[in-house]
């Protein structure tokens, strides 16, 4: 996957974000995407080739690996990043639509008094208010939901966040209960706990930003004359 393209797209969203949102994007890029691309792939490598079972029965090793690791950690994290990043793109699409509408009205002469030219529309600072506030807030809410959902799926699918050194398997076509060994379990456990911890930090940042937006929205409402 081209993570550079994703970084470029989300980097454009960064200028519409709050200060907390900018911190979230920094954590996403440095502590998740960079770690996933640079380090995690080296740790996992060819997982199935390094999964060893004490049997020569054809197919037993493959079945046992599929039973304990139905989805690769790397692919699950990549899928998580895609889901978590997608709501932020809705904000960029909303801003692009707003500017397109303003350009259309400017060309028609409906708002010529508000802007000197089209370039001023492009460089106008975007404020998180009105319908954009709802889009931005909804995107944060769905980010929290996706983060929490993937953490739950990860915990259930792998029976916790630690990597076992030895797993026992009796699935067909294994002749009996066989012992299977996972390579570099401690190193993988460290990476897994790190990625889960960063997910937790991202959830905390998203919840904090959501509370900040709600408080600002409510305080703005209270200042309006009745």
Swiss-Prot record:
- Alphabetized UniProt keyword annotations: Calcium, Cell junction, Cell membrane, Disulfide bond, Gap junction, Hearing, Membrane, Metal-binding, Transmembrane, Transmembrane helix
A Pfam short name: Connexin
UniProt xrefs under InterPro entries: Connexin, Connexin26, Connexin_CCC, Connexin_CS, Connexin_N, Connexin_N_sf
Q: Which residues lie on this side of the membrane: Extracellular?
A: 41-73, 157-189
Intramembrane parts of the chain: 2-13
Q: Could you name the Gene Ontology cellular component terms for this entry?
A: connexin complex; plasma membrane
The secretion signal range is none
> Which pairs are disulfide-linked?
53-180, 60-174, 64-169
| Topology of the protein relative to the lipid bilayer | Multi-pass membrane protein
Q: Which residues cross the membrane?
A: 21-40, 74-94, 136-156, 190-210
Binding of Ca(2+) occurs at 42, 45, 47
What are the protein's GO molecular function terms? calcium ion binding; gap junction channel activity; gap junction channel activity involved in cell communication by electrical coupling; identical protein binding
Give the Cytoplasmic membrane side ranges: 14-20, 95-135, 211-226
Location of this chain's protein in the cell: Cell membrane; Cell junction, Gap junction
Task: Output the GO biological process annotations, alphabetical, semicolon-separated.
Answer: cell-cell signaling; gap junction assembly; gap junction-mediated intercellular transport; sensory perception of sound
| Known function | Structural component of gap junctions. Gap junctions are dodecameric channels that connect the cytoplasm of adjoining cells. They are formed by the docking of two hexameric hemichannels, one from each cell membrane. Small molecules and ions diffuse from one cell to a neighboring cell via the central pore.
Record's subunit section: A hemichannel or connexon is composed of a hexamer of connexins. A functional gap junction is formed by the apposition of two hemichannels. Forms heteromeric channels with GJB4. Interacts with CNST.
Q: Which PANTHER family match?
A: CONNEXIN (PTHR11984), GAP JUNCTION BETA-2 PROTEIN (PTHR11984:SF46)
Q: Which family does it belong to?
A: Belongs to the connexin family. Beta-type (group I) subfamily.
Q: Spell out the protein name for this chain.
A: Gap junction beta-2 protein
Q: Which gene encodes it?
A: GJB2
């Amino acid at each position: 996957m081209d993570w550079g393209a994703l970084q470029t797209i989300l980097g454009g969203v960064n200028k519409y974000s709050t200060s907390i949102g900018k911190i979230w994007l920094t954590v996403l890029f440095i502590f998740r995407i960079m770690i996933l691309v640079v380090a995690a792939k080296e740790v996992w490598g060819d997982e199935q080739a390094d999964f060893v079972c004490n049997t020569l029965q054809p197919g037993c090793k493959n079945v046992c690996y599929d039973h304990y690791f139905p989805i690769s950690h790397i692919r699950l994290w990549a899928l998580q990043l895609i889901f978590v990043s997608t709501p932020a793109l809705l904000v960029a699409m909303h801003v692009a639509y707003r500017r397109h509408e303003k350009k259309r009205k400017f060309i028609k002469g409906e708002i010529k008094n508000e802007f000197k030219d089209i370039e001023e529309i492009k460089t106008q600072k975007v404020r998180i208010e009105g319908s954009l506030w709802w889009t931005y807030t909804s995107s944060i809410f769905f980010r929290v939901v996706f983060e929490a959902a993937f953490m739950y799926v990860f915990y259930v699918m792998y029976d916790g966040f630690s990597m076992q050194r030895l797993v026992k398997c009796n699935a067909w076509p294994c002749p009996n209960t066989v012992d299977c060994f996972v390579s570099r379990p401690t190193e993988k456990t460290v990476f897994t706990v790190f990625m889960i911890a960063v997910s937790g930090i991202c959830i905390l940042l998203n919840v904090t930003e959501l509370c900040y937006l709600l408080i600002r929205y409510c305080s703005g409402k209270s200042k309006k004359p009745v």
